[in-house]
Each structure stands twice: as structure tokens, then as C-alpha cells.
Amino acid sequence: MSAVVRPARSGDEADILGLIRALAAYEREPDAVVTTVEDLRAHLFADLPRVFAHVAEQDGRIVGIAIWFLNFSTWTGRHGIYLEDLFVDPAARGSGIALGLMQALAAEAEARDCARLEWAVLDWNELAKGFYRRLGARHNETWEPWRLDGAGLAALQRSAVGDALEATEATEASEAREGSRHPPEIAGMIDSS
């Protein structure tokens, strides 16, 4: 039986999470997934969602996922779709499910007037690279993906807060020395109230 590709709906979260975990295992990161069913429900089905999913359903079972979000190109002045995860259950592969999911995203891109559809692929995943080449996609050799997360992200956030706090403290100290933080013509009116 062929698969039906459709937007994810409430109630799909557990199946989606199962496929996310299977993808993580395939990508040699089986313990990396901390997302919960509740996280997926909160993000995929929020009043104004910022992440979306399409699923492929075969014989009443979800066997494929495409999880995506909108990004924006300042050069084209248009949104794009970034495909975060594409995965098909290995038992269901070879029946056009991945192609159907990508076609659904291409239709979303057209409906939303998006300039592009983009994603990242692991350097060792030759099977995926071959599939994407057959779609007509090309590897962008100019841009390298970079990421800041975990301790590095926290350290940057702390340094930004620290810098802002230092600047605020310096401003307050300067104002205290000068007696007012307001121009002389209005200082008396504001500082005395």
C-alpha cells in the first residue's frame, strides 16, 4: 500500500518522537534526543507554531517525517524552508516515501512563496546525498554550517549579561557622581518627583 503524506496533527507526537529517536540512532547519536512528546505538542501545535511537520502514513502507521521551519533570506527578501529532519522507517524505504515528503515541502515552499528549500546532511551519509542529488539539489561548498550550543552558548549569554551589567553599573556610577542622569533643564522636575 502506498503512503499518504499529510501535515502532522495532534496525536501524532509519539510516532514522530519515535522516528526522531530512530534518526538519532541512525546518525550515531542515540542518546542525544531529549525532546519529549510534550515538547513536540507545544511546538508543533502552538497557536502560532514556528516549527512544522509532515508525516507519511502507511497502513495506519506513521513511517516517515519531515520536520521543518521557516527562515529568511535578506538577499531575496523572501522566506525559505529549512528541513531539520527527514527520516523514513528503514522497513518502509524504497517505496517513494522520502520523495513524497520532499514533494510536500516543495508544495509548501511554493504556497508560501519561499525562495528555497535547504537542509544539512552528515558528511558520511552517501545514501542521503545520492537521494538529494537525484532531486536536483546541489551541495553548497561555499557555506559551512556553524553552531553554538550547550556550554558555549551559556558562556556567550553570560558574557553578554556581564557586559551589559558592567555598562549599566558604570552608567549608574557616572550618574551618581554627576548627581543626575537627566539633562540639567529637566533634572529638577524629574529627579524630585
Q: Model segments located where?
A:
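Conserved GNAT acetyl-CoA-binding A-motif
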Residues: E110-A120
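Conserved active-site alpha-helix within GNAT-family acetyltransferase domains
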Residues: L99, Q103, D123-T142, L148
